[in-house]
Amino acid sequence: MSFSVDVLANIAIELQRGIGHQDRFQRLITTLRQVLECDASALLRYDSRQFIPLAIDGLAKDVLGRRFALEGHPRLEAIARAGDVVRFPADSELPDPYDGLIPGQESLKVHACVGLPLFAGQNLIGALTLDGMQPDQFDVFSDEELRLIAALAAGALSNALLIEQLESQNMLPGDAAPFEAVKQTQMIGLSPGMTQLKKEIEIVAASDLNVLISGETGTGKELVAKAIHEASPRAVNPLVYLNCAALPESVAESELFGHVKGAFTGAISNRSGKFEMADNGTLFLDEIGELSLALQAKLLRVLQYGDIQRVGDDRSLRVDVRVLAATNRDLREEVLAGRFRADLFHRLSVFPLSVPPLRERGDDVILLAGYFCEQCRLRLGLSRVVLSAGARNLLQHYNFPGNVRELEHAIHRAVVLARATRSGDEVILEAQHFAFPDVTLPPPEAAAVPVVKQNLREATEAFQRETIRQALAQNHHNWAACARMLETDVANLHRLAKRLGLKD
């Protein structure tokens, strides 16, 4: 089978459509699935010896949240090492990273797999993976044809990364190179709230402004602080953490500003405080609302004048510290109640950030669940950890009062429970492995199934045919909307409809 000029032109056109890179990437792999008639495809970005999914088609949504470290995925490592098309035989002993991650076929393993490494010059920047349930699914395509696909995808990804780098340098003063290399924090989520938060982090990171990060307990405020620091010019210097809620009043001033020998009973030597440790770097004050009014006054002086005094010392020390503060309280209300200084609040909240609760982040819960599943898989040495459809449905309908932290603990607990009740190193998380209170799931729609005098295959096809007809009618004959309603891939739906005689 050969690609026509029209097919290649169509792929190139799809890469130019859409507003953002994410939209273009999604269009690319959706088009590839239709052209190559594969069951699943993914575009991955390579960074720090791991592949990060940018867009997927035909795979479970939680794949977007997973991070595929080369050490734990030998097929992806083989793709990263190769300089050309990689075809894995159907009987390959190397586990496929997407086994169990094709919706509706969690118990089946992928049989055909092709990997296309993507390069910018001599540098590996990503990969395209194509998967199928039939062993010979990609035999009709030559390596040369697949190289053309890889070249188009590599060009699109390279341009996107270049634009991202240029935008980052435009926001940052001076040369961005020294601190770009230390970026490690991963903010997982594609919801509007998280997308906006990521943009605001990029903007404020370039400055030296103090930042007040507000959000409920467990939303990831510390992660936001790390992301700000790692994207800032101060990233080559330390990020120092202090939990104000766990700070006894008797030692709080010493922890912040340090002390000299003999300043109080037990002060047997000079000791630097957190501000000194963070000099030329960043100090993250978690739960800032727990500080006493007396300490708030001393903190305000540091923010105003940039000098500190160790406990027991008359001399002042100059420090250059950026302060990031976090709270789960409404500090405006605390100011009105007289429990927080208004002048300190205004000093800290030069650029306020709000971290949305998990219940307002939509499908991000599934992406995060995928990330935690992959973390558990690596930690416990499992070959795969998969979320069943029932588990995904449960996670999407629970409101998570403990936010991301509660989700993380729930996934870890569920993996341990599922592992205990299943032999082998493959774990499928079911709804019963989670212990959420008072979760109300939408009732399944009742459907009258007529008794028919047919064999099993004919009865199954009749049911599929009627189900698709009803879904099309409800969605005004929009095939994409119909596929979403039936929770299947639109390309697979088209093929099934043709086989059932619903399409020419």
Swiss-Prot record:
Pathway: Nitrogen metabolism; nitric oxide reduction. SUPFAM superfamilies: GAF domain-like, Homeodomain-like, P-loop containing nucleoside triphosphate hydrolases. One of its GO terms (biological process) is phosphorelay signal transduction system. Disulfide bonds: none annotated. Residues 479-498 bind DNA. GO terms for molecular function: ATP binding; ATP hydrolysis activity; DNA binding; DNA-binding transcription factor activity. Residues 187-416 form the Sigma-54 factor interaction domain. The modification 4-aspartylphosphate is found at residue 57. ATP binds at residues 215-222, 278-287. The keyword Nucleotide-binding applies. Keywords: ATP-binding, DNA-binding, Nucleotide-binding, Phosphoprotein, Transcription, Transcription regulation. CDD domains: AAA. The keyword Transcription applies. InterPro entries: AAA+_ATPase, GAF, GAF-like_dom_sf, Homeodomain-like_sf, NorR, P-loop_NTPase, Sigma_54_int, Sigma_54_int_dom_ATP-bd_1. Required for the expression of anaerobic nitric oxide (NO) reductase, acts as a transcriptional activator for at least the norVW operon. Activation also requires sigma-54. This is Anaerobic nitric oxide reductase transcription regulator NorR. It comes from Escherichia coli O17:K52:H18 (strain UMN026 / ExPEC). The lineage of its organism: Bacteria, Pseudomonadati, Pseudomonadota, Gammaproteobacteria, Enterobacterales.
